[in-house]
Amino acid sequence: MAPPARVEARVPTAATDDWGRQPDSLMSAVPPRTLEAGVGARGSGSASSRLWIADTDFRLHDDIGFFIQRMLIRMEPTRPGAPLSLDDPTAMVARIQAGEIFVSDATLATLLNQDLAASRAAVRNLRMSTRKDGQEVRGELLRKGRWRPLRMLTEIELSGPLEVTLVPRRIFVDGVEVTSSLAAASIEMSEVLKLKTRHMELVGNRIRVDLDGLFPPPRLDFRVSRLALADGGMQLALGDSLADLQWPALRAPDSYMFIEGGDIKMARTVLVKAYALFTSLSPGQPLLFNLYDYRRQLQNGVIRLREDGMVQIAVSPVKAPAPLEARL
């Protein structure tokens, strides 16, 4: 069993934290606040929480997640009056108001492979290699009872607020290029390959990918406003412009999560009208937060409390390796 989290009310100013700075510098990173008289010990009456994120490796679990450069999320419980429980991601909705994220090839491949496997599709074991000028997709194609190597050189387009489209430019089956023969016979890919799953559909020579509900809980309510290919994945702009946001006046490290408002249930504790700053326990490393394994991270982290109810949590990146494709 992991050791319990350490709770420190005030650390002597002579001590230093993992950044080599005095812990009080983190305790004062968030402006002081005054709680309204209507805020009780069991609940604040707030219907939602604002989650501000900067330069954070955010995982839903070990092999699914994305790197968030900047983001504002409004978190709401699905049951009115209930606190947001980190132990039950299905009971919350994350409404992304604005943000910029990087989705790695490994994460996208894992999500699509899970979708293909659930539908027993004739394509499996996708692997992706993305560059700024295009993407290479490798996998296996079921033809005449045999799984055969499949390779495609594709472009990726944003075809809707919740849809991206893979457009194959060159197609190889069993190591043989079939692009020109299909074109010469005026045959579209969908005529020789039937592909329709919950989130993927081959229409003509285009593979549509529906992003709505593709990620595991919590429910993500968002729209993609811009897509750009990058080495190793996709850069997505979500929701409104970040420039229109009034960011909190924090004096925090470059990498953090800041929760403001609402009631948050973590393990057996409820943060009433939450006012919490999450930072990394590892010196010089970005915050890595693993939602499905947050308890283990907190057990190996450090929690500090302030008189006005602000909580500063230094998170340990335990059990959180870099994403790898799930071969199904």
Q: Model-flagged regions — what are they?
A:
Residues P4-L328:
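Extracellular/lumenal and peripheral-membrane lipid-interaction modules
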